[in-house]
A protein has these predicted regions:
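Class I S-adenosyl-L-methionine-dependent methyltransferase catalytic core
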Residues: 1-182
Length: 182
C-alpha cells in the first residue's frame, strides 16, 4: 500500500512536537514528507480557534501519489513532491517534520537551509544523532549544538502507532534567528 519509509506520526508525539514551538498563529508552516498529514492535522487542531481557513496556512510536500491524494482530500496545499529538491517561493518560519528514517539527516539539513527564520521540529532515527559517522551527520551535530536541542523519545512508534517499529526516535528542535541586515 504505502512505501516502507511511511511511519505516520502518533498524535501524542505530534503534541510533544507542537509544545516545543508555542503559539502557531501568524506562522507560515510547512510539513515536508507529510505522509497523510498528521503533523499538519495537529497544527490545524491548534490553529482552528484563530483562523476560519487554517488549512491554507499549513503547506505540505509529499512524494507518494496515494498520500498526495490524502493530503489534497484534507484541503492542504501541496506545494511540492520531492522535499530534497524543493525550493520555496515563500518564506516558512515553522517546519514540522517526520522524514524517512533512512535519510532524515539530509531532510533536516535541507529544512535548515530553506528556513528563513523560526523553528524546525523534526523526528529522527536516534542513531542519526548518536553515530555521527558521515559528513551530513557531523554537520547536523554542529547545527544542533549551536541552534537547538534534542529529546530522545525512545520507541515511540512501537505501541499505539498506525505503523509500528522498534526504531528509537529523537526529537530535534532547532531555532534560526532572523539575519541582521548588513
Amino acid at each position: 500500500m504505502y512505501n516502507a519509509s511511511f511511519y505516520p506520526t502518533p498524535p501524542e508525539v505530534a503534541e510533544k512536537m507542537l509544545a516545543k514551538v508555542g503559539k502557531l498563529y501568524e506562522r507560515s508552516i510547512l510539513e515536508p514528507s507529510a505522509g497523510k498529514g498528521d503533523l499538519a492535522d495537529a497544527a490545524v487542531g491548534k490553529l482552528d480557534r484563530y483562523y476560519n481557513r487554517c488549512r491554507e496556512v499549513v503547506h505540505c510536500i509529499e512524494i507518494e501519489p496515494e498520500l498526495q491524494a490524502a493530503i489534497r482530500g484534507k484541503g492542504y496545499p501541496l506545494v511540492g513532491t520531492d522535499f530534497l529538491t524543493f525550493w520555496p517561493d515563500e518564506k516558512y518560519d515553522l517546519i514540522l517534520m517526520n522524514p524517512p528514517f533512512a535519510n532524515g539527516d539530509a531532510h533536516l539539513l535541507h529544512a535548515w537551509e530553506i528556513l528563513d527564520h523560526g523553528d524546525i521540529v523534526c523526528l529522527l532515527n536516534e542513531q542519526t544523532l548518536l553515530n555521527p559517522c558521515t559528513s551530513n551527520r557531523k554537520l547536523l551535530a554542529t547545527i544542533i549544538e549551536e541552534h537547538g536541542e534534542v529529546e530522545h523519545l525512545g520507541s515511540c512508534f512501537a505501541e499505539d502507532a498506525l505503523r509500528k517499529t522498534q526504531v528509537r526516535v529523537s526529537m530535534v528542535h532547532l531555532r534560526k534567528k532572523r539575519e541582521e541586515p548588513k
